């Protein structure tokens, strides 16, 4: 075996420039496969961890996916709001432990503004039921206090004490700015890898205060209420967009859900976050399969390149293989020699691809986190990643057997006879 390995190594070294291209091709396919698999895994984990520890999300009757999108991911808009009376009825339900109202509709320089209660900072959880943490500052307490997510602070360069103004309307479609009622940033949340990072948080009373002179989504002509006078008005919310609900006993979730769906005050619906997240992922997860398929095709092309390189080199190696057969090498030895060469090339390619993937994660992770909120960790390979690497190694070894069979079929005389 040692002699066979020595022959295989010397033969490969003799054709090192050609094989180097094959090694790089396999490394590239390994890099793509592992990269896509890691992004797919982390993306799904980040997606599934957007909200946890919440038993129900309640909103106006609509589709479960739509309710999840605007209440958790700040995407889209609610068809209707729910009245404050309904929120109070939820809070009074004997099976409900806590309720965190959510009010959306405004924005700040493209980032969503979420009005909520201070319970949001102690009740909302993400990931493995992790609580929100402040990177600096404190939760909002005064009327015009604001707490911004990590991505908002990093992209806009905000720190505690920064003055900001909010705009009516979501995203870039701002109707008008509430320039007469500026907010002060009092806290910056630690990064979570969830939509919280891209959100400006204010109190429910503050949302009412900046819309006192607004009716039907537009400011009343000639009416202006200065910021210092808004406290004279009743700032209790009239309605909210949705509410996060925690139960005293999770076993009662379907009973409370049924009570909400039959609530007579107004048409409401309640969704289980985990179920709704799975439904949404089944729709948007098609893209990950397409990426994985493309990477697999790249790997297939690389392996085809390995076969073609070895096949093309057979003509150059006719004499080498013929000499081996002349000294007693059988089919088993020829196959073993070429299979060993193929395995060496594949192993080198896979190892180089793993190194490239690790370097890629280390270098691109900060950029992906800053641009897309996607956190990639330099953790040990997952089971799927081990299986992908093993599949590449086996496929490379099998691909090298095809030229071996072809090589043995060449006649001994053909290999030993000189060609002019």
Language model feature labels by segment:
Residues 33-122, 138-142, 232, 256, ...:
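Hydrophobic, regular-secondary-structure patches
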Residues 296-301, 311-313, 318-365, 387, ...:
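Transmembrane alpha-helical interface segments in multi-pass membrane proteins
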Residues 351-391, 401-414:
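Short helix-loop junctions at transmembrane helix boundaries
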Residues 24, 289-309:
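Internal alpha-helical transmembrane segments of multipass membrane proteins
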Residues 177-184, 188-288:
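Mechanotransmission and gating elements of multispan inner-membrane complexes involved in transport
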């Amino acid at each position: 075996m040692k002699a066979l390995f020595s022959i295989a190594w010397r033969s490969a070294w003799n054709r090192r420039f050609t094989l180097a291209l094959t090694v790089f091709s396999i490394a590239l396919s390994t890099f793509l496969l592992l990269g896509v698999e890691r992004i797919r895994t982390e993306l799904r984990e980040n997606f599934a961890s957007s909200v946890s520890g919440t038993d129900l999300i309640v909103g106006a009757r609509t589709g479960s996916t739509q309710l999840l999108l605007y209440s958790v991911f700040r995407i889209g808009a609610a068809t209707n709001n729910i009245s404050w009376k309904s929120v109070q009825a939820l809070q009074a339900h004997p099976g409900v432990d806590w309720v965190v109202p959510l009010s959306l509709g405004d924005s700040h320089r493209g980032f969503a503004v979420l009005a909520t209660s201070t319970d949001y900072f102690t009740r909302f959880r993400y990931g493995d039921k992790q609580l929100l943490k402040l990177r600096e500052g404190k939760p909002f307490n005064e009327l015009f206090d604001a707490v911004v997510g990590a991505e908002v602070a990093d992209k806009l360069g905000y720190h505690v004490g920064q003055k900001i103004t909010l705009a009516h309307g979501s995203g870039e479609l701002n109707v008008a700015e509430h320039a007469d009622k500026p907010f002060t940033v009092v806290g910056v949340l630690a990064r979570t890898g969830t939509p919280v990072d891209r959100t400006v948080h204010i109190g429910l009373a503050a949302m009412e205060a900046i819309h006192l002179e607004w009716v039907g989504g537009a400011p009343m002509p000639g009416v202006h209420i200065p910021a210092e006078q808004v406290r004279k008005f009743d700032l209790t919310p009239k309605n909210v967009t949705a509410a996060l609900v925690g139960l005293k006993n999770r076993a009662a979730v379907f009973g409370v859900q049924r009570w909400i769906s039959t609530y007579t005050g107004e048409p409401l619906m309640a969704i289980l976050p985990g179920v709704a997240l799975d439904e949404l992922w089944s729709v948007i997860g098609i893209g990950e399969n397409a990426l994985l398929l493309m990477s697999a095709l790249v790997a297939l092309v690389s392996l085809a390149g390995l076969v073609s390189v070895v096949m093309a080199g057979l003509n150059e190696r006719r004499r080498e293989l013929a000499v081996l057969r002349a000294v007693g090498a059988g089919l088993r030895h020829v196959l073993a020699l070429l299979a060993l060469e193929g395995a060496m090339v594949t192993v080198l390619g896979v190892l180089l691809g793993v190194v490239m993937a690790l370097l890629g994660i280390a270098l691109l992770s900060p950029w992906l986190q800053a641009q897309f909120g996607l956190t990639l960790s330099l953790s040990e390979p997952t089971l799927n990643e081990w299986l992908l690497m093993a599949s590449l190694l086996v496929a490379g070894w099998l691909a090298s057997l095809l030229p071996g069979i072809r090589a043995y079929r060449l006649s001994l005389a053909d290999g030993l006879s000189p060609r002019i």
